[in-house]
Amino acid sequence: MLDADIQAMLDQRKSTMSAFTAEHRALNMYAIFRADLDMTPGKLCAQGGHAFLQAYEKALIQRPEITSHYKGTGNGTKISMYAKNLGQLIRAYRDCQKDSIPCELIIDRSHIILPHFTGNPIITALGIGPAYKDEIAHITRRYTLLK
């Protein structure tokens, strides 16, 4: 048996699911990581946290209505993906900019985890969204899901 406050959280989440009708357009957020950096699981999690948060903060300014809708449907879906290298990550960043989709490059600094993290600034990830799945599919289809 769950405590009443926890049950209330589950019930509230269930009520937001009623918004998912046939006309519903899926809103997602994405974190795309550089596969060539071989980040540890802990490092990936930290960079993903930065990616989702910074993209969301940018979206609050760029697209407040969509961001509010994302928040109102239980914070939507978050998807983590790999880009092969920095070039692929920059391509996604530029494509999002061109389409006015909120995005933010994540730049790690001051951490030393050799060989890639030497203490100098390094681009590790890209945060995107919230964005409608159908408006961003032409960008995200190039990347692979994290396993």
State each model region's role:
Residues 59-79:
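Active-site pocket-lining segment
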Residues 2-6, 74-84, 97-147:
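Short basic, glycine-rich beta-strand/loop surfaces that mediate nucleic-acid
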Residues 43, 47, 84-87, 134:
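Conserved active-site and cofactor/substrate-binding residues in soluble primary-metabolism enzymes
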Residues 87-96:
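Short amphipathic alpha-helices within nucleic acid-binding modules
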Residues 35-39, 85, 130:
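A generic structural motif
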Residues 19-62:
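Glycine- and Gly-Pro-enriched alpha-helical subdomains that act as flexible
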Residues 14, 50-54, 58-59, 77-82:
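N-terminal intrinsically disordered, cationic/polar leader segments
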Residues 1-26:
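N-terminal accessory/pre-domain segments preceding catalytic cores
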